[in-house]
């Protein structure tokens, strides 16, 4: 029994190193999303779409909060945090529809990265990591549901500027996503999480 305890203890640091590397790599995705969403917020504000702009600014802040959660996990696990370099994001989009199509693709990429982290944590038997990542799995379900919903609404609006302005107003009032369900709780928006 003593021998198996020593083996498990000696393997844990190497297993945790792999997970730590993967989490640090994922931090780049969270910070890049935050930076990209800030650029999107600015672009939308320049187009006088205050509702969409405010929504994307909130999304930018939310992504930094996600990164902070992972940083807290690493610090609490006595692991090294490596802050990533963030590239300058795009600053132009062909349309509001094109912008939200990019949001949806970005969220799908973040989801894939979280799923990769979860797989590593499960493989390494890191229960505290899977517990932390459970929240992210539910959050990403919500994030993708919201992005998909907005893309569908914008497709319905098409070239109708009145419909676009109505949707922008709904974002400004905070009612645009009130019926989007997602996450494990099945309740409204991610801001309630």
Regions found by a protein language model. Name each.
Residues 1-193:
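Iron-associated oxidoreductase/ferritin-like identity signal
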């Amino acid at each position: 029994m003593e021998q198996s305890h020593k083996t498990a203890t000696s393997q844990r640091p190497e297993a945790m190193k792999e997970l730590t590397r993967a989490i640090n790599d994922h931090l780049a995705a969270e910070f890049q999303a935050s930076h990209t969403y800030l650029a999107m917020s600015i672009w939308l504000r320049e187009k006088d779409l205050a509702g969409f702009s405010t929504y994307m600014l909130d999304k930018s802040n939310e992504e930094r909060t996600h990164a902070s959660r992972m940083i807290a996990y690493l610090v609490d696990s006595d692991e090294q945090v490596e802050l990533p370099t963030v590239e300058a994001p795009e600053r132009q989009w062909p349309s509001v529809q094109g912008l939200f199509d990019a949001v949806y693709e970005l969220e799908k990429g973040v989801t894939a990265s979280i799923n990769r982290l979860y797989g590593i944590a499960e493989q390494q038997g890191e229960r505290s990591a899977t517990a932390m990542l459970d929240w992210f799995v539910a959050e990403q379900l919500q994030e993708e549901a919201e992005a998909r919903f907005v893309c569908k609404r914008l497709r319905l609006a098409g070239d109708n500027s009145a419909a676009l302005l109505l949707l922008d107003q709904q974002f400004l009032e905070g009612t645009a996503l009130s019926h989007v369900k997602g996450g494990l709780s099945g309740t409204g928006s991610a801001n309630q999480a």
